[in-house]
Amino acid sequence: MTPRDRRRFDEQLDWVMARMPPLVHELIEKVPLHVEDYPSDAVMDEMGLQYIDELCGLYTGIPIGDKSVTHSGVMPDVVTIYREGILSTAADRRGEINLDRLRDEIRITILHELAHHHGLTEEDLDRLGYG
């Protein structure tokens, strides 16, 4: 990923976050948002991925409904979004990035991963249009 691509992505992420409802900002205070270029080798192996642009985001943690006192001392919940995956999803056949589509993909990915924090499954998200 070039510094220009990273900068362009981050500018659009800032644009999207500035327009998210206050509730989303409150959630991100509790479940931090990390931004990486692509998933680590460990994440790719664990998820059975072959290409770095296959994954747009990942929720790591224990969903709210599954938490109990026995989960004290575990790593904190985190939402990670991956620039390469989101840029790939927002690109047309020629590899050109449509800014509106990029913004939509960033927003959808963040909301999708926050929904996992609240216990929604991939099937639930598909039904809601956030799959």
Language-model regions: role of each:
Residues 1-105, 117, 121-124:
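Active-site rim/adjacent substrate-binding subdomains
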Residues 123-131:
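Short, highly charged C-terminal tails/helix-capping segments
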Residues 109, 113-117:
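Catalytic glutamate of the conserved HExxH
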